[in-house]
């Protein structure tokens, strides 16, 4: 069973609630953390297949993969 940090759970919950891809900056703002910290956790979740991403211009948009379960 995979274990997630409190921040990873919050990120997945935000993405689930949004129902659409969100840019790194918006996720960071909702969590009151830096974009660098948000990106670090998002990249870890992406490596584990929990989220996907796409770069558009200067922004990177993130979404929860459909196979991912949100842990509250």
Question: Where do the PLM segments sit?
Answer:
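Alpha-helical DNA-recognition elements
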Residues: 44, 48
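Residues within the DNA-recognition helix of helix-turn-helix
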Residues: 41
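Key DNA-contact positions within bacterial/archaeal DNA-binding proteins
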Residues: 36
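Short amphipathic alpha-helical interface segments
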Residues: 8-20
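Short, cationic-aromatic polyanion-contact patches
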Residues: 1-8, 23, 55-72
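A short acidic, leucine-rich amphipathic alpha-helix
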Residues: 26-28
């Amino acid at each position: 069973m995979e274990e997630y940090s409190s921040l990873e759970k919050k990120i997945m919950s935000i993405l689930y609630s949004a129902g659409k891809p969100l840019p790194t900056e918006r996720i960071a703002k909702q969590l009151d953390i830096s974009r660098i910290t948000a990106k670090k956790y998002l990249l870890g979740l992406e490596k584990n297949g929990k989220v996907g991403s796409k770069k558009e211009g200067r922004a990177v948009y993130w979404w929860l993969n459909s196979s991912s379960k949100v842990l509250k």
